[in-house]
Amino acid sequence: MPVSTRSKVMKQERNEQENTNLNLPLRNPHQGLKEKMRALTLLYEQQKRASFSLRNPNHNQSPKPEDQRFKTQLLDSSKKGDRFHRLDGKDSTFVEEDTKENNVFEADRIFGVSSVPVKPSGVIRKLSMGNGARNVSEAEKLESLNASVSRILVFVRLRPMGKKERENGSRCCVKVLNKRDVYLTEFTNENDYLRLKRLRVRHFTFDSSFPETTTQQEVYSTTTGDLVEAVLEGRNGSVFCYGATGAGKTYTMLGTMENPGVMVLAIKDLFAKVRQRSLDGNHVVHLSYLEVYNETVRDLLSPGRPLILREDKQGIVAAGLTQYRAYSTDEVMALLQRGNQNRTTEPTRCNETSSRSHAILQVIVEYKTRDASMNIISRVGKLSLIDLAGSERALATDQRTLRSLEGANINRSLLALSSCINALVEGKKHIPYRNSKLTQLLKDSLGGSCNTVMIANISPSSQSFGETQNTLHWADRAKEIRVKECEVNEEVVQVGEEEGADQAKLLLELQKENSELRVQLAKQQQKLLTLQAENIAAANNNNNISLTPPSISSLMTPPSALTAQQKKKPRHSLLSGTCFTPESLKRTKAEEAVKELQLTVKALKMEMERMKREHGLQMKKQKDELMKDLCSRKSEKTPERCKETRRIVTRGSLRPKEKEKELKSPSHRFASPVAAAKKRSFWDITVANTSPALDRRKTRSHGLVHQEAPSKLLQPGFARPHMKH
């Protein structure tokens, strides 16, 4: 075949292939993205419905007619020859659009380029749910998760409108309904065209909302009453107030003398319950009070250097923080008053007594008891009461003063707190607790095993609308924080066999002594009763014999109680017998019996004190004997050759040796040595060896030789020489 005809044939075949490619419909490149978007929209709607059904189980939500395209669907991928996949239950409009697109573009080929057939996306299979079966399984999983994990309880308290706010013409923008719902209304200007279409009313729902007429006792009983009971059982609890400056946080936590706050009421309730439970065990209450001021931790009960935060297995600990043991409510009130005096409060633009620091009051309750096997059971509960400083906005005209620096540090710590709340809500692995000292101290309260209560304080004034909206927003976010289920902090200390035997022996001895003392007390009571009966019988016999009661009076009143005039002038009238009726006799006898019983009880107490002292002396003797035994064993282990090499140093060994043929005078023992052989004292040695004494410049005074005066110091081994006159 000639070359020309061959080229013509090849061109003709190439043109035919291009024509066939042109006739084929092309694939839409955006078809896969559309399928993914539909699947994600479907998943979002299903998750939204599931969460709504969990929050409101009694609410039956009926699907809207226009939302039929978001029904649960499954891909029909059984046919391999299909060019596109249809979703069951689609509207006709969506089917027509897909058919139009697929008529124009082929699903497997792109113009001019051969491609691999597109596999149906597996995302839709995973995300689509059929007939609500998986909704039920996910709901069960969420219920089981909620049973094992608790959340933070969030409460909102609205303060009343202030006098200055009324004078400035501010309006109330917050309304509390049904003690749960909070409605926030924004008052805008008609000339503010940018905010005309903005949503004016916002609705929030919390665990409980307190209007401005709520008392302090109602707030405490609703928010913190159950936490105190849990702390006594060995669990951890924390309460903190959040809000803008001037919203009433310090009033809610501390209160006044007439209306005490949550801290004071919690302490009173705690000690009242401790007194009720102290019969079956031993309760110990420790107290500490600290503040975070400008990112430094201070001790309010004993001010001094800043404290350092350290972390161990038990949690965040402030090194050097003093803990006071409290025995009564009055002691705690005195400590609180002293700590509040040391707290940093300064007047600001919004509040005359604004808190410039975050205050944290920690109350640790330890309960110890013994079980049947004499093991010590220890339960420790911690209650943290936190008063946060208020966030405030700095004006552009404010100078860089101390107040502005304090406000910047407060806002920085509250920003770190809000970032921790965001991370906890979103379920992130890393929670930025170390961004601030405040979040480090609140680590156990936010993400640990702790029952946490948040009280959001808001202002009703329309002038502080932004701060109120921000506080309600973060409080609504904090509702979603999940914390671990709080377990009982219980520790069982098992007593060793030897210690257990000694303690059991001591317990048996004390029980035996107690039983013996009880027997003696019963005998004394029996004797007392017999004496009383004999006295009453004798008195009755004397009354029957004669009407005069001198015998009865002599029995009832001791002779020392009679005055001199009564001894000189005894009464013999018949009317005197009416002074001693049987009722008065019984009364006096009962008084005597009570006095004798008091004497016996006093004697028994003295005997018990004596036995305790003897027991203490005996334990001390045993301890001394044990120490002597240990010392003797240690001395026996030392080698004997050390004893031989020991040298006893005395004053005689330190004296200079006597020269031969030296005459001894009678006053040799009492005279000091010769001046030439005089010993040099410490000060002479140090002065002579100093560099200035060696290198200093000689003058005329140095050339003169001065005779040294004899030292008046008492030399070792010699007596003071006699003074010559």
From Swiss-Prot:
A Pfam family annotated for this UniProt entry: Kinesin
Compositionally biased residues, Basic and acidic residues: 655-665
InterPro entries per record: Kinesin-like_fam, Kinesin_motor_CS, Kinesin_motor_dom, Kinesin_motor_dom_sf, P-loop_NTPase
Sites where the protein binds ATP: 243-250
Stretches assigned to coiled coil: 499-541, 583-617
Protein name per Swiss-Prot or TrEMBL: Kinesin-like protein KIN-8A
Family: Belongs to the TRAFAC class myosin-kinesin ATPase superfamily. Kinesin family. KIN-8 subfamily.
Keyword Coiled coil: yes
Disulfide bond annotation, renumbered to this chain: none
Region annotation Disordered: where it falls in the sequence: 1-32, 652-672, 691-725
GO function term, MF aspect, one: microtubule motor activity
Ranges where the Kinesin motor domain occurs: 151-481
Biological classification of the source: Eukaryota, Viridiplantae, Streptophyta, Embryophyta, Tracheophyta
A single cellular component GO annotation: microtubule
GO BP term, example: microtubule-based movement
Keywords for the protein's UniProt record, in alphabetical order: ATP-binding, Coiled coil, Microtubule, Motor protein, Nucleotide-binding
